[in-house]
């Protein structure tokens, strides 16, 4: 009779880069003692495309189609940060209507991103049904995007000084209908998921991050707010016109995977509130501002001198980025998305440093999975919400 051999030594397992629950081309080298995780080393770089270097050889308007490939599930945010940086450098005033349209698009994009987090996260821990439900609502968001921008994904909609096109006729009514419908959808998710005993068994108390830990690791977004810190850049930085709307920052105290789920569910409802207020109060007026005032040039006494240049919508060289440094950030669905921009009196940026939320949030993964079970890696990694396009850039 053959006696099964038992191994006493540690086992090293490669998870990814092709594993379906890796959310892209992430590779984890996991050291196991039976089912217990002893060590975990993430290997990055499989999706590196040199996004920062490409930016240094493009004007901002030429670079806009590239940025939607960072976080390809929340493309409006990457576009927003790309146009916000030169707007602040050039002191460009965005018309009120354009600002409202931007907020609506950003919040719709946040909902689409959270939906496509929720489905695969539930599939990772064994619940297949919500994966199909979320596509029903996400499809409606993409229909709205397609009607307004012409593209379902990779919209290329934001422009320096405004947006590419105004909202089409009937779009606002269609969006209001979606808001009413989506609230019933969220209630359905909560009924299906939140009190499910198997779900709670898998997420409650798994991957706990304390307040000090969250701050020291530089976490942001739902990862930070699930640990009891009420930090949302929409409230902190007062960008666009978020101050004009009534909404609450979503947060939880426990810091586990369940808290991160609850924060994101709450954020989807808060986003609907913001969208409804923006749609009801959207002002008239232009949707773009095509001129930039030049305050840094000496006055020329000639009679026909213009003190402003026009911002081109074509991919030709636009205005020069003045010689200064600037850090701009927005509250993306995954956390703080930032750009460190150095201008050099040139149409190209001298340096374009991207601060992706996923890359920084992912750093805490090895610490969270140590002394946990192998199956908990999926739960913890899923609750972080990463997209490898922005991690590897």
UniProtKB/Swiss-Prot annotation:
Name this polypeptide is given: NAD(P)H-quinone oxidoreductase subunit H, chloroplastic
PANTHER family annotated for this entry?
A: NADH DEHYDROGENASE [UBIQUINONE] IRON-SULFUR PROTEIN 2, MITOCHONDRIAL, NADH-UBIQUINONE OXIDOREDUCTASE 49 KDA SUBUNIT
Q: Where in the cell is it found?
A: Plastid, Chloroplast thylakoid membrane
Q: Which GO terms describe its molecular function?
A: NAD binding; oxidoreductase activity, acting on NAD(P)H, quinone or similar compound as acceptor; quinone binding
Q: Which reaction does it catalyse?
A: a plastoquinone + NADH + (n+1) H(+)(in) = a plastoquinol + NAD(+) + n H(+)(out); a plastoquinone + NADPH + (n+1) H(+)(in) = a plastoquinol + NADP(+) + n H(+)(out)
Query: Where do the coiled-coil regions begin and end?
Result: none
Top-level taxon: Eukaryota
Main location per UniProt?
plastid
InterPro entries linked? NADH_Q_OxRdtase_suD, NADH_UbQ_OxRdtase_49kDa_CS, NDH1_su_D/H, NiFe-Hase_large
Q: Which residues cross the membrane?
A: none
The GO cellular component terms are:
chloroplast thylakoid membrane
Natural source organism: Vitis vinifera (Grape)
Is the keyword Transcription in the record? no
- GO process annotations (BP): photosynthesis, light reaction
Tell me which UniProt keywords the record has, alphabetically.
Chloroplast, Membrane, NAD, NADP, Plastid, Plastoquinone, Quinone, Thylakoid, Translocase, Transport
């Amino acid at each position: 009779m053959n006696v099964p051999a038992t191994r006493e030594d540690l086992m090293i397992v490669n998870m990814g880069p092709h594993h379906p629950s890796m959310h892209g081309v992430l590779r984890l080298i996991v050291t196991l003692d039976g089912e217990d995780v002893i060590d975990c080393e993430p290997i990055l770089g499989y999706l590196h495309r040199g996004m920062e270097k490409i930016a240094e050889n493009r004007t901002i308007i030429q670079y806009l189609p590239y940025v939607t490939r960072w976080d390809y599930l929340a493309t409006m945010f990457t576009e927003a940060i790309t146009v916000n940086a030169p707007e602040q450098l050039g002191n460009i005033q965005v018309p009120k209507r354009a600002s409202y349209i931007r907020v609506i698009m950003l919040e719709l994009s946040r909902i689409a991103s959270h939906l496509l987090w929720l489905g695969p996260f539930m599939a990772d821990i064994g619940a297949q049904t919500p994966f199909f439900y979320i596509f029903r609502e996400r499809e409606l968001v993409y229909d709205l995007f397609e009607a307004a921008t012409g593209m379902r994904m990779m919209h290329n909609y934001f422009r320096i000084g405004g947006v590419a096109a105004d909202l089409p006729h009937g779009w606002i009514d269609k969006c209001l209908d979606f808001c009413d419908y989506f609230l019933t959808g969220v209630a359905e998710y909560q009924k299906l998921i939140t009190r499910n005993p198997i779900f709670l068994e898998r997420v409650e108390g798994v991957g706990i991050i304390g307040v000090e830990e969250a701050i020291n690791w530089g976490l942001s977004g739902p990862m930070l707010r699930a640990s009891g810190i009420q930090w949302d850049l929409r409230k902190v930085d007062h960008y666009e016109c978020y101050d004009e709307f009534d909404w609450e920052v979503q947060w939880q105290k426990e810091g586990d995977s369940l808290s991160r789920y609850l924060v994101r569910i709450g954020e989807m409802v808060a986003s609907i509130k913001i969208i409804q207020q923006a749609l009801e109060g959207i002002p008239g007026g232009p949707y773009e501002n095509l001129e930039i005032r030049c305050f840094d040039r000496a006055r020329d006494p000639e009679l026909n001198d213009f003190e402003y240049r026009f911002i081109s919508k074509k991919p030709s060289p636009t205005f020069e980025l003045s010689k200064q440094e600037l850090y701009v950030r927005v509250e993306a669905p995954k956390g703080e998305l930032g750009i460190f921009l150095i201008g050099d009196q040139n149409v190209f940026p001298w340096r374009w440093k991207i601060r992706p939320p996923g890359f920084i949030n992912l750093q805490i993964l090895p610490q969270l999975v140590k002394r946990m079970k192998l199956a908990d890696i999926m739960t913890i990694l899923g609750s972080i919400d990463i997209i490898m396009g922005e991690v590897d850039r």
